Amino acid sequence: MKAFRKLLLGLALPTTIGPLLGLLLTNTDTVKNESLTTVRHRSSINQDFDGIFHTVKLLEPIQQSNADPAASFALFQQKFPNLKRVANSTLNTFDVYNLLSGWKSSLTAYLNQVLALQQRIKAADQIFPNQKETLPKDENPNIFEVLGAYGGKGFFPTLGSNGLHLPPQLFQFFRDFQLSSFTIKDFEVALVSEPDIVQHDKVRYAFQVQFNLVLQLQINRNPVLFDFNLQLKTNNFANQTSFDELFNEKTNPLNWQFFSKLKVNHLVYEGNDITQLANTLLQSQFNVLQLDLNKSIYRLNLNAMAQRFEHDWVQPLYAKRTQAKIAYEAEQARIAAENKRKELERQKLLAELKAKAEHYQKIKQARENMLKGLKSITDFVKFWKSPDRLLVGFNKQDDITTRAGVYKALQIAYANYPQWTFYLTLQGWKNGSELLLKRPSWTNLLSDIHFQKAFNLKNTVSEQTLGAATLPGYGYYGLRMSDWLRWALGYYSYIHMGVPQNVQTKFTGTPDNEQQVWIANEPFEWNKHYGVGPKYKDKAYRFNMEISFELEGWIAVKWWAWAFKGSIPGNWKGKLKVTHLFDGMVPVWELGPVNTHLPQYSFTDQQQLLFVPHSIQKIEAIGADKGINDLLKTQNLHNLERLSYESTNPIDLISYLLYAIQYIKV
């Protein structure tokens, strides 16, 4: 090793040797303190070449101690601990070589710092990510560009601000990118030579730094591979004087001029291989760079840059993302609260809709049950005492055993089922009449508080008033006849009629057959539901009901009246069968204002349901003694059609129904 650790300086070699690459020393310690003259003197080739400074590369293998750029740079740092020492010293070729060897470590540290600062920027996503496709500049800085600005004039490299001097057409792809990874290969510092272009027998020298750099980039979130060789070459020097002019300038030490050349090995952008295009654009151009190696290599202060970057970019970004997170969380809380409110409203609405649907279903079922309740009085009472009554319009305080309760129930029922309500009220008339006709005496009927309540009668009324209060009426005074006949029977004879016996009722059909039971759904109108002529007959309503009973009694003409009795039998004792026929026929003659009451089925403000039926009363003697039949025929009592205005006074169907309800046990 001792033999080839010598540096060959000042050798004048023939130009045929060509440019010799690199001043590579295995150990500079043996020569670092020697002058150029001394070194030249030690060379085995000692010829006078007019002071021109020549070097050649050792032919033997390079020793590891000098092949490591880091070790070479460490020698420079050891010899020159600060810039002042550099300024006060004279650099030799070893020093320049060792300084340039530090470019690998500084470039490595620089790129690692870029990666670290990128991670600091990316860490903002852990606070709160920005999902925008294109981030604003303050959230996505080009760190090469930022650090290049921090480094200032002469700082190298500054890829982000085109420190590599790429052609504009090529550099357009590299204005906004991030570094994913890098690899530095084949780093070499060499002292190269070339013939002087004027004096061909002379050689000029320069230091050359070259390396391969492979960058894995992210451009617009797309991966880009950029593999290139970079060559940096100093100005040429030929002797000690020109060497010192380049490398020992005292006013601005370590500020040297370089020529750069770049060759692209591989460039792929968005899946397109543009390597050939890049090299075509680059061609063989050299770029002149005035570089400050003090801040680029010797005193590369990445910590200060990182601190400044932290202050200028990272902390503002973190603060911005923190505020964005606070705003986002507040908005999310608001949205969550709003969604919760909407969900509660939705659940409430669904519950309301469900409740309404269930309520509607209950109402629907209640209405169906109400219809069933119109089939009989017992079912009617059951329904209007059931909970379903509250679903169709009844209140808890409404009582079906009162006039007000019956009145309200019938109004509700009629609004829903007019045909069956009509039927139910006729059943109430029939059943109520049957109940009152079966009372054992008129006084017994009069004392019935249910009867008094239903028909609004006091217990002090006369038998005559009682008999006329209902249709059919009770007993003798319940028979419909002319006032003159009733006076004559009482004046010319003694007469007695017992209580009704063998009471029979008959009702034909249901609303299922509208030919038997039917009522117009709308208010009755002249010449539509009733009027002149047969075509209007039986139009307002249809029904057929029969109520019959028997009266046992006798008639005896007074002794003085035999001459005046007319058709009144002198003595008669037997039974009369009284039959009342009711239907919905309308009189066929032309109606006048006082001839008869028009058809009516209407609720009044006095809690009444007034009804005008067509009525025929038939009376005939049955049994052995039929002597009274002549009188009945002459007075038309055998077939009395009640058509006069007085005899067609409306009856109150609520009274009969209410009376019947009092005796329903449910």
Swiss-Prot record:
InterPro entries on file: DUF237 (IPR004306), DUF240 (IPR004319)
Pfam families: DUF237, DUF240
Top-level taxon: Bacteria
Family per similarity comment: Belongs to the MG032/MG096/MG288 family.
Protein name in the entry: Uncharacterized protein MPN_035
The species this protein was found in: Mycoplasma pneumoniae (strain ATCC 29342 / M129 / Subtype 1)
